[in-house]
Regions:
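The two-metal-ion catalytic cores of nucleic-acid processing enzymes
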Residues: 1-275
Length: 275
């Protein structure tokens, strides 16, 4: 249910493949200190082009060369009354040249024609044709990228663009959100929580993220600890040695912008009170 918009400052971004889909998680706190998580699906992608240039290079020719790289055939036929076949594979006159929508490859959700300026070398700002490969998840993207890069014909014929860019950085770029900035999102409470945050919101996509021009800092909670150990042998203590003990732990916790500081000392035996 939509109640209102909520503003919070992000402190951590994470991305995972969940149920065969890539999802982005943004964690942070509101100005009143409530922990917040926003998550949404995202489709990672990269671009592929040909190293050769000229008028014969088009989006469709790139796609054809890509399919040749993997020895995949795309054959489309019109219905044939002669052979009573819905897709006749016997009569050449019924065959047609594959169209853009006929190309399909497992793991790739869709192929998108794209034109952009190649920053390598001098191109006089002329755009070159490329094909944008959109994937369902990061596993499929990494697998397909490796298949192209480690193919024997890759260095000779193909170029990959932005294939090593982390999808999290891509989300920040396209949404114009900074890694530790303030953002505003619609207050859609999720029906099934995946975290222990006070507020968890599930969005449709990254377009629901609105960056805010705020310089204040949310009351993030900082925790620190220090341990004192005993070593049976005098060497560095080992957790696998039962005689090497942690005999004292010191803890502090503070919320940013607030003077209260929590101090806790834990000891395996009574100790003298600190001054």
């Amino acid at each position: 249910m939509l109640a209102e918009n909520i503003q919070f400052q992000t402190i951590s971004w994470e991305g995972y493949d969940h149920e065969d889909r890539y999802r982005v998680y943004a964690f942070g706190r509101t100005e009143d200190g409530r922990s917040t998580c926003v998550h949404f699906p995202y489709r990672p992608f990269f671009y592929v082009g040909l190293k050769k240039d000229g008028p014969n290079v088009s989006h469709l020719s790139i796609l054809r060369e890509l399919f040749k790289l993997f020895d995949r055939k795309v054959e489309k036929y019109f219905p044939c009354d002669r052979h009573n076949n819905e897709h006749c594979g016997f009569c050449d006159k019924f065959a047609r040249t594959p169209l853009w929508g006929d190309y399909y490859m497992p793991g790739v959700e869709r192929f998108v024609p794209h034109s952009s300026v190649n920053l390598w070398g001098f191109n006089n700002e002329n755009k070159i044709p490329t094909v944008k490969l959109v994937f369902k998840n990061s596993k499929s993207m990494r697998s397909f990228r490796s298949k192209i890069r480690f193919h024997q014909d890759y260095e000779k014929n193909f170029q990959l663009f932005e294939s090593n860019l982390d999808p999290i950085l891509r989300v920040m770029h396209v949404s114009k959100c900074s890694s530790t900035g303030w953002i505003k999102v619609p207050y859609f409470l999720t029906t099934e929580k995946h975290t222990n945050c006070d507020i968890e919101i599930e969005l449709q996509n990254y377009k629901d993220l609105t960056p805010l021009d705020r310089q204040d800092i949310a009351p993030f909670r900082t925790g620190s600890f220090d341990i004192e150990c005993f070593s049976e042998t005098g060497a560095f203590p080992k957790s696998t040695n039962k005689e090497d003990l942690v005999f004292q732990i010191g803890l502090t916790r503070q919320d940013y912008g607030r003077p209260e500081l929590m101090k806790v000392g834990l000891s395996v035996a009574p100790c003298q009170e600190s001054q």
